[in-house]
Amino acid sequence: MPLARLVEGEKHDECTYVAASSLLIGRHKMLRSLIYASRRWSSSVGARFSSREELQAYLARPAWQPEDYLPSAEDIARQQLSEEETRKLLKLSGLPEADIQEVRRRLATQLSFVSQLQSVEVDDCADPQYAKAMQRHPAAIGYEELVRRAELDAKDTSLGEKSGSWDSTATATLKKDGYFVLREGLLQKR
């Protein structure tokens, strides 16, 4: 029964209200689907591709070139490290000091590239449709919340993890309530 026929003040049974509300819900769903379809088909980005080859040709055409983001010769010269700094970095990383000049050039290129990446402005208000699942600025948690999360953390048995399987004091000769016991004499012999 259409809702227009339900007149205020008249007595109607429960079935009449159920039928009327289901009709209203059905119309609401139909309207929503029509609005969605009209939004989907009314917006246009460009002409449709007529063939698969046309689509592949469009996708094969680059929209940007890597050279646009690589540093210029001036940037490389400005970012180049001294020989001492390069030797120190090679020593710290355990790499051989074979061709210092080539390593300096590569490091300068990489530093210039990183500088260019850091200079790109990033809008902090991302569109929620494209935002990642992680929050950009997660709130700090307290000690109690950390302990609660650690207790709720389930072990992955497929990786061989067993809950409560590690006892740090199992091999200790002196222990009490899960703690190591140290004698004063051991501390003085240091």
Curated annotation (Swiss-Prot):
<dbReference type="GO" id="GO:0032543">
    <property type="term" value="P:mitochondrial translation"/>
</dbReference>
<keyword id="KW-0436">Ligase</keyword>
<keyword id="KW-0496">Mitochondrion</keyword>
<dbReference type="GO" id="GO:0005743">
    <property type="term" value="C:mitochondrial inner membrane"/>
</dbReference>
<protein>
    <recommendedName>
        <fullName>Glutamyl-tRNA(Gln) amidotransferase subunit F, mitochondrial</fullName>
        <ecNumber>6.3.5.-</ecNumber>
    </recommendedName>
</protein>
<dbReference type="GO" id="GO:0050567">
    <property type="term" value="F:glutaminyl-tRNA synthase (glutamine-hydrolyzing) activity"/>
</dbReference>
<dbReference type="GO" id="GO:0005524">
    <property type="term" value="F:ATP binding"/>
</dbReference>
<comment type="function">
    <text>Allows the formation of correctly charged Gln-tRNA(Gln) through the transamidation of misacylated Glu-tRNA(Gln) in the mitochondria. The reaction takes place in the presence of glutamine and ATP through an activated gamma-phospho-Glu-tRNA(Gln). Required for proper protein synthesis within the mitochondrion.</text>
</comment>
<keyword id="KW-0999">Mitochondrion inner membrane</keyword>
<comment type="subunit">
    <text>Subunit of the heterotrimeric GatFAB amidotransferase (AdT) complex, composed of A, B and F subunits.</text>
</comment>
<dbReference type="InterPro" id="IPR027499">
    <property type="entry name" value="GatF"/>
</dbReference>
<keyword id="KW-0648">Protein biosynthesis</keyword>
<dbReference type="Pfam" id="PF20977">
    <property type="entry name" value="GatF"/>
</dbReference>
<comment type="similarity">
    <text>Belongs to the GatF family.</text>
</comment>
<keyword id="KW-0067">ATP-binding</keyword>
<keyword id="KW-0547">Nucleotide-binding</keyword>
<dbReference type="GO" id="GO:0030956">
    <property type="term" value="C:glutamyl-tRNA(Gln) amidotransferase complex"/>
</dbReference>
<dbReference type="GO" id="GO:0070681">
    <property type="term" value="P:glutaminyl-tRNAGln biosynthesis via transamidation"/>
</dbReference>
<keyword id="KW-0472">Membrane</keyword>
